[in-house]
Amino acid sequence: MIKRFGVVKLMFCVAIVACRPVWAAAASADVDKQIRADWAREEQVTRKLKTDSYAAVQGVIKRGRLMIADFRKAGAVAAADKAAGKLDAIDAQCKVLLWVKIKPGTYEKLYFEARYAVRELAFANPKIDFKELLFVRRHWPRWNHQCSHRVGEAQKPGANLCVLTSLSPDAKVREVLSGKYTTGGIGRPDLSYDAKRIVFPHAALRAKATGYRYGDPAFRGGECLTYDIYEVGLDGKNPKRLTNDPLNEDTEPCYLPDGRIAFTSSRAGRLVQCGDWALACGIYSMKTDGSDVRQITEPKEGEFYPSMLADGRIMYTRWDYVMKGYNVIQQLWAVNPDGRRAQMVYGDHYAFARGPIAFQEARQIPGTSKVICVGAAHHNSGVGPIMIVDLAGNRGGPDSMRRITPQVGYPEIKFASEVLDKYKNSQHAARGRMDAGWYTSPYPLSKNQYIATYSFDKSNNSVHGYALYLCDVHGNRDLIYRGKGYSCYSPLPIRTRKKPRIIPDMVTGVDPKTPGVLTVSNIYKGLDGIKPGEVKYLRVLETHSKIVHTTPQRCDVGVGSGWDPRGVLGVVPVEADGSVHFEVPPFKQIFFEALDKDYLEIRRMRNFMNVMPGEKTGCIGCHEPYGTLPGKAGKGGPIAMKRPASKLIAPPWGDGAMNFKRVVQPVLDRKCISCHDGSTNVKKTDKKSFDLRGTQMVIAPAPHDRDQGPQHAVSDSFLKLLSYVEYIKVGGHQGIRLPLAVNATGSRASKLMKVLTGGGHYKVTLSTDDWRAIAAWIDCNAPFYGGWDEIVIGKKAPRRPKKAAVPPADQVKSAAERRKAIAGKLPSGTKLEAFLNCGVELTSDKKGTVRITQTSGSPWTLTKGKIAGVPATQRLISFDGKEVVFEVSGLTAARSYSVALTWWDYNAAGRKQSVWVFSTDRRYGSRVVNTSDMPDYEKRKQPPAEISFELGSEQAKAGKCIIAIRKDVGSNCVISEIWITSKNTGASK
């Protein structure tokens, strides 16, 4: 037995020498080393395996055999057979080794042999019919948000369009651009159909660089300017500028088959409602000289990443909040190049919590109905796992999508028990990991093979971690090229392409006031449980884009109602067969609600559509499954089509966004307050104590998200009625309960309308107009505000629970001792105005004239144990992932003020922070303390640092200001104490 094994060992060693691949022998030592290192890191990061293991070798063989099967189906039999022979031999040797004692490195040799065999096959794919690859050499954008790719001001300088002259790690790289075009930032480009020209976004270098203040709506700055679009020959000659708009971002260009260029732009002047520092971009088109700019889409939160479908439509990602949670807020849409027939093509799966939040960078896979895209987070740099989505499948469920990089999880998603069982056996059951690297910008070569950029780094915002890879759907991945000191982005094969179908322009020349016409064949399709004849009206509503900066910059229009004002445009009749035929105004963001005979909602639409002037379009039913046929219609077709299109019947309370005080409060004044007058001399159970006068404004509670800034106020009557209303609580990840069944929300499901039915509430009877007003308010998702100019700020509501009214005695004593110690060290003529012990107090001593109030930040105790030389007050901190904010009030021009604070890095070395001072509306501000290293206690035992700065005379004259402690580097920002001192200036008030 021993001799037999000895012979086997000898045969194995001979086989290893004999199988040395030609590809590896031809590669230089440096390239071979780079490829092997990449493979080893792939196993470690992606699969948690070592290359010197049986499992790793078998994984390569398994994935390789799946690729071999693809090649055989494609007719590349010779290449497939060659690779199969190599893998079979390696597999046989590998299995023999299970029975013998082997030396370290034996499996690793087989692993690399197998990888080279598969790599050779992958690059032999007939679909790789090009020699050169265009890509962007860049640094990753400055901040971790998917908006950053579309913001020139967020780019880190130093970028170029590059041509990789062969698909090899040691290939020569030819730089297309030169001079000033290489000093700024470059975004996602496109290559012309004849492969001779490149259109690309370029952000020029700013003459005087500033830091980019992410999240600050009033700030303009950065190291680069805004994006503009340029075109250049593939040879780099004669670059020409196509757009020139310093106030807007023009980016993500895409060649259209008719010779025009589509692009993403912020020129509609709209803002993102969850944070109005972000620009809401839409899709536009222009001629190749930059003239004749036309708006294609009506953006709400944004529409971006345009690419062409073979049928001539432009596919893009839409981001919108229309009464739905955060689960699926960025879906795939398509539109004709003239703006007609904008419709969702995939992503309407609210019931599915295991799917990605955003579908980005989608491109159609040649010869199929499928697209490849990134399953990105909302709050990352647009990266995640690679997805394949079938546009011919069910657009409202996960069955039509496939995650082809299963080790990489869907970032930022939340889970709930109600969806786990349903999908426990599906490909989506595995959550995936957040430490397996990140993919972006995939480009499909065939139905199974694609090029993408990938980074091993745990941080998705790695400045220079992204490299180019050849990948397939089976998990095979091979390095094409990795740059040194920069990232690669948006690979495009340099080859000619077949132009998509040209869809005729039916909009140009039409009077822009011409209404569109919509048709619903049978509204009962999709309304399970609703009997024919039950739907009597279709309500047409409008959601409004944000166009002005507000304080707060993110503001709920009610209490979990959502961030967008919305109102009723009108109603139209529904025929007995469920058909509807009606006019709608162009360019508006509209959605619909099916109503019963009493104008109560049966079901609502939770995204929006729009029509172009003169456009005629329609749908089958209400939330009908994708691909549903109209079914049998009466003789001669749908009844509604036998007459002219209905015109909208405006609501009796007038047009405009729904406003509680304008529409509902007058009804309460007429019908309710004679009883519900808020009398205080009665029992709380008495109807009179239920005050519906609406005379008091109170701070709005926040069911999921507080406003980003001071919390808004609502009337007390609004809050009282709200408890009797069934509406969708927007915010957080509440989309897991959607879509809701019919009658699940809105006026038909609300207790308020049931109480008011038929005079059952103390014989109170409402007119039809009053009844409709209250029902419509509920069905607009119960908003309080109807516009951005109406917002009433209540107070600065801290993003944390209030501390106990009376802090523990030891903390009170420590703070008092600290105040006394600080005051005792002040020079003559200097007064301690206010002191705040962060982490314990929200407001400084109320006895003083000057007040410090903390408006954001959470409390934390660094250590309960004493530290020599460190006051107890400095062991308590406030922290925040972005900034800890204080409002200072009670200042006067008669005194000059100094601010001092203490901070330290107790347990996480590497933090860096800065300090900013703003006007209370944040329109004006400046940095008063530059980015500073925090004292490192963990490693160097450095004590807390005391930082001080002067407040300007403008703050003293204004009487108040905002002080923000900002995180520049690290996981969060921290502060222990803050105090203000003053001296008499002799100036008059």
Where does each model-flagged region fall?
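Aromatic- and Gly/Pro-enriched helix-to-coil junctions and flexible linker segments
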Residues: 25-44, 48-55, 59-62, 85-102, ...
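Conserved beta-propeller blade repeats
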Residues: 133, 183-193, 247-260, 300-315, ...
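Short, conserved, GDST-rich strand-edge loop motifs in beta-rich repeat architectures
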Residues: 135-156, 201-225, 263-279, 316-330, ...
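Compositionally biased, intrinsically disordered or flexible polar/acidic segments
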Residues: 6, 819-989
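Beta-propeller blade signature
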Residues: 160-165, 220, 225-235, 278-289, ...
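Long amphipathic alpha-helical scaffold segments
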Residues: 75-175
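Multi-bladed beta-propeller domains
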Residues: 169-184, 234-248, 287-301, 336-358, ...
